[in-house]
Swiss-Prot record:
SUPFAM superfamilies reported in the protein's UniProt record: Light-harvesting complex subunits (SSF56918)
Organism name: Rhodobacter capsulatus
Protein's name in the database: Light-harvesting protein B-870 beta chain
GO molecular function: bacteriochlorophyll binding; electron transporter, transferring electrons within the cyclic electron transport pathway of photosynthesis activity; metal ion binding
GO CC entries: plasma membrane; plasma membrane light-harvesting complex
Length: 49
């Protein structure tokens, strides 16, 4: 178990925070990829400019 001194205000150790950040960033990247593909599909189907 981590010492109280090793924890940040979130209660996570540095290793746990880095792992959570990596998972969050991969989910964000997937969301952005889907959003870009959806925008391209709509732009091909019905251009808005």
């Amino acid at each position: 178990m981590a010492d109280k001194n090793d924890l940040s205000f979130t209660g996570l150790t540095d290793e746990q925070a880095q792992e959570l950040h990596a998972v969050y960033m991969s989910g964000l990247s997937a969301f952005i990829a889907v959003a870009v593909l959806a925008h391209l599909a709509v732009m091909i189907w019905r251009p808005w400019f």
